[in-house]
Amino acid sequence: MREILHVQAGQCGNQIGGKFWEVMCDEHGIDATGNYVGNFHLQLERVNVYYNEASGGRYVPRAVLMDLEPGTMDSLRSGPFGKIFRPDNFVFGQNGAGNNWAKGHYTEGAELIDSVLDVVRKEAENCDCLQGFQICHSLGGGTGSGMGTLLISKIREEYPDRMMLTFSVFAVPEGSDTVVEPYNATLSVHQLVENADECMVLDNEALYDICFRTLKLTNPSFGDLNHLISTTMSGVTCCLRFPGQLNSDLRKLAVNLIPFPRLHFFMVGFAPLTSRGSQQYRSLTIPELTQQMWDARNMMCAADPRHGRYLTASAMFRGKMSTKEVDQQMINVQNKNSSYFVEWIPNNVKSSVCDIPPTGLSMSSTFMGNSTSIQEMFRRVSEQFTVMFKRKAFLHWYTGEGMDEMEFTEVRANMNDLVAEYQQYQDATAVDDHEDEDEDEAMAA
């Protein structure tokens, strides 16, 4: 089986991860003690993508939980699904990273990383055919960003040919909870560009917007936000876990979505997003799902796809539906909005269909888009970084852990290069290149 090893790092990562496993257990009919209580044989057919089977028929999540302080893990352990995780797989320190990337990456995190890698190795050795790793973390704090990226680079060294998928929660544009967030995020993006294969970009502001505008919640909690993220996470991997007519896995996803190796930051969306009370008043249709899925207001990161162009996109539908109709709808979207797709990648939307809908819905769809407009997020973080770095504000916290200023200059340059690359492909047209080729041929002659 094609197993996935799940890692959650830091407070944010562990809270999202906790919610994710609740959704997984729900879909596979597994209760809070790890016993199967479902009533549908397909729930167990590929349950080992995410679960190990222990003695006595219990199912244990293939999850590694790490943090530099015990708090979040304690609350996970005492929560409703706390008993389901393998106790050895909780790896935590006592000191915390104090929102300092350097502590997570170079000092505190570096001391703990070997014990995390031992657990990762043990889980990987138990797999028949490990497909890849998925990592939940935020880029604003110290542990998820610093230690999370350290772990990614170590896993990269040891398992270079396995897929590395991250669910990364970015800094909020207005009013972050951490002053040094721009530093932490820029240092992390530098690592993700080099070592991750696919990054699903999420951010709290966009999730809050969805909660207010679409779900009509008056005061959304982090629980509501994490629920949105976890439904999307489950949609990304449903093809691996349930049979479908058009399957996809992490590698197929990467091949279809990444035209240039550094540009692997995706926007994600999910449909149907309706407020809790209004679901029973409408029936879902494929055109409706498609329309909502491509709606800019449904994107889970604060970048507007209408400000850029899609290089590629992928749509995963769940539920009983005709693949012909799905393809038809996708072609419709591309024809109607052709200016938002680059014309030099024809047919750049991949769709896949999985027969089993999520709990409580008749059909749903998950969207992933590689859009050049994601540069808005990087540009915003980079501007905040520059303003602080110019005055060397807060820098002593990082240099005190052994970093030097050169590293900061380097990560800023890398972030700006990334923005420039997105801009370059946004402006590229299909025509320019033919002229270049003619010139090349003339020179060769």
Curated annotation (Swiss-Prot):
GO CC annotation terms, alphabetical: cytoplasm; microtubule
Sequence positions that bind GTP: 11, 69, 138, 142-144, 204, 226
Keyword Nucleotide-binding: yes
Keywords: Cytoplasm, Cytoskeleton, GTP-binding, Magnesium, Metal-binding, Microtubule, Nucleotide-binding
UniProt-listed InterPro entries: Beta-tubulin_BS, Beta_tubulin, Tub_FtsZ_C, Tubulin, Tubulin/FtsZ-like_C, Tubulin/FtsZ_2-layer-sand-dom, Tubulin/FtsZ_GTPase_sf, Tubulin_C
SMART domains named in the record: Tubulin, Tubulin_C
Gene3D superfamilies, sorted: Helix hairpin bin, Tubulin/FtsZ, C-terminal domain, Tubulin/FtsZ, GTPase domain
PROSITE patterns: TUBULIN (PS00227), TUBULIN_B_AUTOREG (PS00228)
Superkingdom: Eukaryota
A GO biological process held by the record: mitotic cell cycle
Chain sites annotated for binding Mg(2+): 69
Cofactor annotation: Mg(2+)
One Pfam family matching this protein: Tubulin_C
Key word Magnesium present: yes
Gene Ontology MF terms: GTP binding; GTPase activity; metal ion binding; structural constituent of cytoskeleton
Subcellular location: Cytoplasm, Cytoskeleton
Function: Tubulin is the major constituent of microtubules, a cylinder consisting of laterally associated linear protofilaments composed of alpha- and beta-tubulin heterodimers. Microtubules grow by the addition of GTP-tubulin dimers to the microtubule end, where a stabilizing cap forms. Below the cap, tubulin dimers are in GDP-bound state, owing to GTPase activity of alpha-tubulin.
PANTHER family: TUBULIN
Oligomeric form and interacting partners: Dimer of alpha and beta chains. A typical microtubule is a hollow water-filled tube with an outer diameter of 25 nm and an inner diameter of 15 nM. Alpha-beta heterodimers associate head-to-tail to form protofilaments running lengthwise along the microtubule wall with the beta-tubulin subunit facing the microtubule plus end conferring a structural polarity. Microtubules usually have 13 protofilaments but different protofilament numbers can be found in some organisms and specialized cells.
Name of the protein in its database record: Tubulin beta-1 chain
Source species: Glycine max (Soybean)
Annotated gene: TUBB1
